[in-house]
Regions:
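FIC/Doc superfamily catalytic core
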Residues: 1-305
Length: 305
């Protein structure tokens, strides 16, 4: 059964804007980011997603863990990060439309943190803030059936991937299939669904914007709960995705020195190219500046003419 939601004018406008920005990303070769930028964005993703859940480690500490350096911090926080690093490094090994793959990802993400890692919950749960019960999840014996239906929905080829990713994220949070780790799994799986059609999402840290607008994130979940459909959450998440793509494009269009431009371009891995190809990546560059850049690259033995 298809989960309930409405396509509002705001959703249509955001989908149009996102599609245009993805086109610009592809035209600028931004799906092939430099290794350094990919690493930075991966760190932001892990830091932001875990920060939402109360993890106290900084981006610098996460960088150190990626580089196999020792970090002093709460044991639980360190383990959460180490698990997340392993999972995000093998993102393309998971199948977004498979519940078995979903459970495997949860097992690896929560390994050593809870006894029931990789298993759906076998007890009732509710989300309490202060003294107020914010959300009572469906009975535990309904969880396998509800999740099976949700994964069937993911296989619907008529649904837009952008919409599907948001709907899955919301419905999964509503079902609350695990005792712990639901939030980080929702964000991880939305990334995976988006990656199935758009390569840029493998390294687009939209979680950073969720972390900065956390109150709006939870408000959109609550409003969707109250209305009985995921429309509010879809609007929120599409807005986050649109702004994250805008940030990526702004970063690419920033003022760079010739060495920075050359380094960035070389990291794209384009083996044979001409001045026009170079200028396609750096849209605001004059032909004279592009020629000077490429001449400098030859003089530095970074390029062959």
């Amino acid at each position: 059964m298809k989960p309930p939601y409405e396509i509002t004018p705001k959703i249509l406008k955001l989908i149009t804007s996102i599609s245009e920005k993805i086109g610009e990303v592809n035209a600028n070769y931004l799906t092939k980011q430099s290794p350094q930028l990919r690493k930075q964005n991966r760190i932001k993703t892990i830091h932001s997603s875990l920060k939402i859940e109360g993890n106290t480690l900084t981006e610098e500490q996460i960088t150190a863990l990626i580089e196999n350096k020792r970090v002093i911090g709460p044991e639980k926080d360190v383990l959460e990060v180490l698990n997340a690093i392993k999972v995000y490094e093998k993102l393309d090994s998971f199948n977004f439309s498979s519940d078995k793959s979903f459970l495997k990802a949860h097992l690896e993400l929560m390994n050593g943190l809870i006894e029931s890692a990789g298993k759906y919950r076998t007890q009732g749960v509710g989300i309490v803030k202060g003294t107020i019960v914010e959300h009572i999840a469906p009975p535990f014996d309904n969880v396998p059936h509800l999740m099976k239906d949700l994964f069937e929905y993911l296989k619907d080829s008529d649904e837009l991937t952008l919409i599907k990713s948001c709907v899955f994220h919301y419905e999964m949070e509503f079902i609350h299939p695990f005792l712990d780790g639901n939030g980080r799994m929702g964000r991880l799986w939305q990334t995976l669904i988006l990656m199935s059609e758009y390569a840029v999402f493998e390294f687009l840290p939209f979680e950073a914007l969720i972390s900065k607008t956390q109150d709006d994130y939870y408000k959109s979940l609550a409003l969707s709960d109250k209305s009985g459909k995921s429309t509010f959450f879809i609007e929120y998440m599409l807005d986050v995705i649109e702004k994250s793509l805008k940030n990526l494009l702004n970063y690419n269009n920033r003022v760079l020195k010739d060495i920075d431009r050359l380094e960035y371009f070389l990291n794209l891995g384009i083996k044979e190219f001409n001045r026009k190809d170079y200028m396609n990546v750096f849209k605001d560059l004059s032909s004279a500046t592009a020629s000077r850049d490429l001449k400098k690259g030859v003089e530095m033995n970074r390029l062959e003419s």
